[in-house]
């Protein structure tokens, strides 16, 4: 029972969604955030390829200039809106002090996104990934990032994931809510699996959405610079600049595998059957379809 208490000790609900306690403490600042019309929001459920799509977008903004992308770490170039860790991290403050055009990272579901983003009609990119691979990646994230309780065994963690008892709540609700928002021409809805399968096609889609002109040279440069191996070895994207007491990559690297289908190495037959049954219940009303392998 104690381990259950320890687990929830780190989190607090905000509008019915489980969230990191440190973030909730300053929630008023997040809700009151003032968007600008030329802000671009990159929204994802955690562990869905946020850093990957962020670096692609940043490269489009910088017209493929790799050196400009390496001038600072990604969490300074694209601040994490709701992130707050006392004096260490403050997404709202970072963004307030930033010149336009700003790129804003968030894991918030649409109903928690500050109202000013909708009022200013900001463009939003939403990237999602199949639930099984997200659950695996989230499990390893719990193990290596400070501020997370012990996730228990993998099957125990999957149970919590299925019930939405993880930061940012239910994956099912998150993706379904954003899928509805994706019907707006101001929201581009992308799948991680599509990026893995045909990166060129998805990069061109992003360039068009951002109203830039695609050239073969630009697309080639983006594809090379944002490949998994390049980003894993790049200190401005691999989070190795963070001290071990915040993110201990000796336990699990931040850039772990970057593949589709790793869930097969973690789900037993019984766990997979249980997950599939629950998944079907949660997603039966939705037209949203995912691929768990490519």
Curated annotation (Swiss-Prot):
EC number: 2.8.2.4
Entries under SUPFAM superfamilies matching the protein: P-loop containing nucleoside triphosphate hydrolases
Gene Ontology CC terms: cytoplasm; cytosol; nuclear membrane
Annotated GO biological process: 3'-phosphoadenosine 5'-phosphosulfate metabolic process; estrogen catabolic process; estrogen metabolic process; ethanol catabolic process; positive regulation of fat cell differentiation; steroid metabolic process; sulfation
MF (Gene Ontology): aryl sulfotransferase activity; estrone sulfotransferase activity; flavonol 3-sulfotransferase activity; steroid binding; steroid sulfotransferase activity; sulfotransferase activity
Phenotype when changing residue 85 to A: Does not have decreased sulfonation activity towards the estrogens and DHEA
Tissue occurrence: Liver, intestine and at lower level in the kidney.
Residues given in the record as 3'-phosphoadenylyl sulfate binding sites: 47-52, 129, 137, 192, 226-231, 256-258
Subcellular localization, as worded in the UniProt entry: Cytoplasm, Cytosol
Record comment: activity regulation: Inhibited by estradiol.
Residues where substrate binds: 105-107
Active-site positions on this chain: 107
Its biological purpose: Sulfotransferase that utilizes 3'-phospho-5'-adenylyl sulfate (PAPS) as sulfonate donor to catalyze the sulfate conjugation of estradiol and estrone. Is a key enzyme in estrogen homeostasis, the sulfation of estrogens leads to their inactivation. Also sulfates dehydroepiandrosterone (DHEA), pregnenolone, (24S)-hydroxycholesterol and xenobiotic compounds like ethinylestradiol, equalenin, diethyl stilbesterol and 1-naphthol at significantly lower efficiency. Does not sulfonate cortisol, testosterone and dopamine. May play a role in gut microbiota-host metabolic interaction.
Family: Belongs to the sulfotransferase 1 family.
PANTHER family (UniProt xref): SULFOTRANSFERASE SULT
Name of the protein in question: Sulfotransferase 1E1
Source organism: Homo sapiens
């Amino acid at each position: 029972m104690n381990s259950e208490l320890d687990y929830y000790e780190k989190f607090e609900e905000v509008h019915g969604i489980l969230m990191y306690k440190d973030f909730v403490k300053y929630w008023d600042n997040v809700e009151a955030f003032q968007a600008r019309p030329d802000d671009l929001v990159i929204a994802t459920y955690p562990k869905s390829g946020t850093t990957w799509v962020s670096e692609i977008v940043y490269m489009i903004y910088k017209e493929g200039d790799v050196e400009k992308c390496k001038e600072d770490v990604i969490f300074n170039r694209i601040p994490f809106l709701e992130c707050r860790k006392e004096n260490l991290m403050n997404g709202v403050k970072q963004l307030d002090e930033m010149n336009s055009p700003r790129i804003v990272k968030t894991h918030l579901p649409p109903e928690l996104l500050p109202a000013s983003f909708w009022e200013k009609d900001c463009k939003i990119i939403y990237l999602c990934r199949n639930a099984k691979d997200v659950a695996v990646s989230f499990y390893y994230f719990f193990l290596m990032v400070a501020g997370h309780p012990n996730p228990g065994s993998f099957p125990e963690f999957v149970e919590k994931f299925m019930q939405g008892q993880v930061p940012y709540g239910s994956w099912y609700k998150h993706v379904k809510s954003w899928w509805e928002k994706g019907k707006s021409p101001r929201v581009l809805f992308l799948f991680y699996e599509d990026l893995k399968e045909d990166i060129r096609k998805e990069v061109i889609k992003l360039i068009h959405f951002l109203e830039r002109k695609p050239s073969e040279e630009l697309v080639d440069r983006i594809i090379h610079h944002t490949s998994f191996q390049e980003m894993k070895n790049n200190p401005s994207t691999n989070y190795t600049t963070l001290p071990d007491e915040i993110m201990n990559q000796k336990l699990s690297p931040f850039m772990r595998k970057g593949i589709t289908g790793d869930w097969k190495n973690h789900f037993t037959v019984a766990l997979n059957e249980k997950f599939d049954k629950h998944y079907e219940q949660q997603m039966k009303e939705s037209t949203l379809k995912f691929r768990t392998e490519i």
